[in-house]
Amino acid sequence: MFISNIFQKFFSFLFVLLITTLVCADPKKVAVIVPLEHDSMYKIVSGIQEALKDIDVEILVKNAHADPNILLAIINQIKDHDIDLIIPIGTTVSQTTISHIINKPIVCAAAIINGKNLPLVTGVNDEIKITDTISKLPFLENITLIYSSSEKVIPEVEMLKLYAKNNNISLYTAMIQNLNDMPIAVKNAPKNTQSFIILKDHLIVSGINILKQEAFVRRIPLIASDEGSVINGATIAVGVQEKQIGVEAGLMAKKILQGIAPKDIPFSDMKDFTLFINLKSFLKQDILTQENLSVLPFKHKEF
């Protein structure tokens, strides 16, 4: 009887200790790195938060404010702190994070990354080629592409140049180094241009107000590559709903935090594309018609 009581007390003690450990255990920490202030970033972060809401996790959101020096400072801070998982948003931020942090799992969101030989890295790709959109608007014969010097966009710039050459489209291009260059760049676009084109180019989309005002003056559309740009005034874009990118990345992060190795979670492509339309901006241009948009093979979302 005495021994039985001892065992009872011992197991009761173990049970209390286990419960106390579970209750007092520190939550996992996830660092989300956003490249700049933009509606699309807020939506992606919101999706990440939604996907992780039912597990004990602390989400730290760090904003690089489109500054490479701030980005490096954030990455170095994360590298030296008790962070369990990192979610960088965008190709440039993801590449920089991967090159500096080699001992923590990384889930890249809205990025094009070659995951070969990167066992701690996985992610979500949401890219759609701008040529896929332009090809469905064959009446556009004179277009202007505004882009930054970011290495990420150069392949798509070259792809658009080749597409324009092969399809007898007059393509005017203007590369800018910073937002101070943008007003002159858009003013210098040919008078006969039928549309401004922008990519998923963080510097350019942060200056969308400059672009849309010039587009309104010319009565031409501003064709973008993401939902957030349309919310902020671009006429149309074909892309994915930004929040869903975050949800997909968050679900990957959840699996990793629950014990699945990143190398066992393949990179995924977002395939459910949507045509985003800003109705106010649409009414301020004379090139695209409702009929043009109605034949595009995507579900529509209007703002």
From Swiss-Prot:
Transmembrane segment boundaries: none
Lineage of source species: Bacteria, Pseudomonadati, Pseudomonadota, Alphaproteobacteria, Rickettsiales
Origin species: Rickettsia prowazekii (strain Madrid E)
Protein's name in the database: Uncharacterized protein RP367
Top-level taxon of the source organism: Bacteria
Signal peptide: none
Gene3D superfamilies per record: 3.40.50.2300
